[in-house]
Every structure is written in C-alpha cells, then in structure tokens.
C-alpha cells in the first residue's frame, strides 16, 4: 500500500495531554486512534490492520479447536437479563451497562457480555447430548458505562472483544474443554508475540466455579499479580491466598481497659501505647445491598496490619446469603451512621458490639452479620475497640465470641507472605494488564434460562457452560506496553500493521524513484505486507514517523540508489546494514523468519 493514495498517516508531533501511559500516548501520536469523546475512539486504517491481524490469529486457533463463529446482537432485551437476575446489578447504581427504552417503553441494554443471549439461543437449538459439546464465538464491539474511562483502549466505553461460549453434557466434559481452551489461549497470546502469565482469578459478576486470567506483565497494569519465583503459584490480588506474617505477641497489661483519648486510628494507638499493628483487631463495617432492596449490616474483623479484600468478602456474602447481592459499601460517613446507627462510637468499635446500635435503622436488618478473618481469629490476645469513646480493651482470646462469627479468608494476600505452612516460598508482586479471561460457569445460566438437553436415558438436564473472553483492542495496546522505546512503537511482527516500510528520501531523484518502484513491486508480488511512504516531505519527517509507528523493518532508499544499494534496518534491534537491492528480498525473508520464531 502507498501512504499517499490508500493509507494516510496521521501522526502527531506533540503528546496529547489526556494520555497518561506510554501505550496510549503512542497510539495517539502514531495516528492509530482518534479520540471522539471520553472513552470513545475511532480506529484509523493503520489500527484496523492491527486489529484484523489479532483477530485472524484468534480465529485460526479457535476454528482449529472446533469452535464456530457467529455474530450476536448488541442490543439485549432487559427480560433476558432479569431472568438471569443480573439486570439490576448491571444497571443500578454503579452498574456498567448502558440501558435505554424504545418507543414502546420496553427496556434494553447495550451488551457488555452475551451469556444471556447465547444461553437463550442454546435452549432453542440444543435438544440432545448427541449435539454436545458445542462452542460458539464472536469478535464484536462491546460497551461499558465506565465511571472513569482512562488509559485509552485499556478502560474505554467501547472496545472490541472476542467472547466464546461452550455447552456440555457434564461437569467433567466442561472441565476438559476448559483446559483445552487454556492451552489455546496460551497459543493465541504467544502467536501475538506477547509475554503473558496465567493466574487464578475471581469470577466476578460473570460467576462460576473456576476462572483464570491471562495477564501481560507491564508497569502500567491496573492489576497486581502475586506469584512464586518457582512458578508453583500465581493469582491476581483479588483471588490470592497466603499466610500473613507472624504477629508480635502482646505484652501483658495491668488493666483490661486502655485509655486512648482521640486515638481513632491504628497508627495513633500503636504510637501512644507502644503496640504493633499485628496486636490489634480492627473492625470495619459494611452494608450489603441486594436486588430485592434488603440491606444487611456486616461487621468484619481483621488483624490490624492486614487489609480486607472486598472481592472475597462480596463473594462470601453472595454465596452464604444471596446470589442477588448488588453492592457492598463500607460505612464511614456521618450521614449514613446517623441514619442507621445509635450511640455508635466510630473509631472505638469492638468485635463484641451488640445489635442494639442498629435496632432503630429504617432500612437495615436488625442484627449484625459477623465475619472474622483467620488473622484475627488466630490471635491469642489482642487490643480492639471497647465500644466506648476514648477507650480500647485487651481481649484474651477471640474464642469467647467466635461462635457468633463466620470465620473465613477475607484478607488481601500481599508481597512477602508465605504461600503455606509447608513451604517457605514467599509471594512476589508485579503489575499486569488483563487481556483474557476464561470461566467454568457451571449451570448458573442454564438453570435460570431453562437451557436443557436430554441425556442418554432421556432425562432432561441443565446444560453445563463455559465462557472465554479476549480483549482484542487491549492486546494491541498491551503489546505496545511491552514493545516500545524512546522513539516509538516496536510491534511484534505477527500483529504489526505491515511487515516492512519502504522510505525513499527524495522522490525527485529518478534513480531513487525507479529503485523504489522496483523494490515495492517485487515485495508486493511475493505477498509481503509492505507500506511505501511516498509522501513529498523531508526525509527526517519520514524517519521520525517510521520509528513512531513501529513497523518491524525499514528500507531506506537514498543516494546509493545509483549503485542499486539501500539501507536495511531492523526496528527492534536498531541494526542497520547496507545491502544490494538484488539481495534485499532474501535478506528480509531470513530476518523476518527470525522475528517470527522469536515471538512465537
């Protein structure tokens, strides 16, 4: 393709102020995307080439796996989502689904995901175990009503995603296919030239028994990965489990009561009373809000040097009390406290606070749901709030109240924790960008949407389901995070918009013009993905743009064209060689093979 006639470049000289991370900056500066509004971008021709190459890699792998491509509607009737009991959670409060009403007043949502629609279709077309397993996938634009769109295509309101859904006759068949898809995902990301790590993950709003995320390691990642050096364990911070550091034994006190005037924080209590945070149990209050409008007050206890993992807590409450949990909100503002709590000593709350303080609430249930993390429950003695302003208490054990408590892991694992009693391995931490996620959904959706099949004995059973997502546009931006330098992008050759860029420095020179056309036509005839920068601009502008847009190889045609010689440059290594145009094609083929092999 020629820049002047079919592939205009829209590069920028200045870095847009809106772009916080390098990959977003380079996508804008390189002319790959154009901002239309907050979190909404146009994909320019050069970006569309990248997207198509990523999509082709995905399609090839999934088709080889026996999956069938389809295209599902983006506009979903609310009725389907209400049957799955996800409508309220996705549209109320901070829900991420754009929703609207048509002329007849019927409710619809713009799809962030397609479990409901595909399950409804499966209920109509799958009748017998003989049709199973089946897997469908699509590559399509998705929508999310992000509260704060940021980082370009990483957290946008529109994005391109591959989502797949499999249907099975048994849990065992689902598990087997899930492992098969895990291997396929590893192949896809490898063939995109990415360095990824698979980690155990939380299933979130999608649900299901098991899930795994695939992360690109990068400093700009919003997620944290906890892992062992040996590779024996890896999980995202929402899912990771570990053993906290050993607490410091509590010294003996002459009195059970500690006077702690204006000492509401753990830092203040430790400083004024010569204590360590591991000797304190902190109490954190939440309210759990459900789709049926009920609200449960949650009292949680955790060791003072640890932090509550709200994802783990959300999942625990959802599993124990109701799967229709919409939100979990920490209670620390005065307005909510005054409305729902009586004589509530914020900053001095103890684990044994009674139910009387919530009896006058008009919206909350009238008794605490009490949950303690293992780190609190395992303490032999500790300091905590006394339920009286300006006083804390020394508790000898947690056992005198633990029969009221649900004991569970609700703690954030962190760097430096041991992974188990049997191992001395410690967790390490790095940032990651999620580009893929696979789930074993089980029968969650088939039960609610009545998707059944007849087994070998003619009995009707619920389908077993899996779902499998890949962020196509996320892959493109994540690849830049892993492959760039001070001058611009350096694409993995597999997903680069072009394999090679031809740059004549002066098209007014007849020798350059003639040699340029000869090389361009030769490469095109061999089906090589080549771009010719035939703009009438200074050579320096072309060189700067070439490094910015990041095509793996460059051919510079300059004064030596009179001798049929050119300069051949590898973008990633910055290696330059002078070579005869006669040997150029052979050199490109051998060098490109090296890059394809390195990146796959």
Curated annotation (Swiss-Prot):
PANTHER family: MITOCHONDRIAL RIBOSOME PROTEIN L39/PROLYL-TRNA LIGASE FAMILY MEMBER, PROLINE--TRNA LIGASE. Homodimer. GO terms for cellular component: cytosol. Consists of three domains: the N-terminal catalytic domain, the editing domain and the C-terminal anticodon-binding domain. This is Proline--tRNA ligase. The lineage of its organism: Bacteria, Bacillati, Cyanobacteriota, Cyanophyceae, Synechococcales. It comes from Prochlorococcus marinus (strain MIT 9515). Gene3D superfamilies: Anticodon-binding domain (3.40.50.800), Bira Bifunctional Protein, Domain 2 (3.30.930.10). It catalyses: tRNA(Pro) + L-proline + ATP = L-prolyl-tRNA(Pro) + AMP + diphosphate. Its EC number is 6.1.1.15. One of its GO terms (molecular function) is proline-tRNA ligase activity. It comes from the Bacteria. It is an enzyme of class 6 (ligase). Keywords: Aminoacyl-tRNA synthetase, ATP-binding, Cytoplasm, Ligase, Nucleotide-binding, Protein biosynthesis. It is found in: Cytoplasm. One of its GO terms (biological process) is prolyl-tRNA aminoacylation. Belongs to the class-II aminoacyl-tRNA synthetase family. ProS type 1 subfamily. Catalyzes the attachment of proline to tRNA(Pro) in a two-step reaction: proline is first activated by ATP to form Pro-AMP and then transferred to the acceptor end of tRNA(Pro). As ProRS can inadvertently accommodate and process non-cognate amino acids such as alanine and cysteine, to avoid such errors it has two additional distinct editing activities against alanine. One activity is designated as 'pretransfer' editing and involves the tRNA(Pro)-independent hydrolysis of activated Ala-AMP.
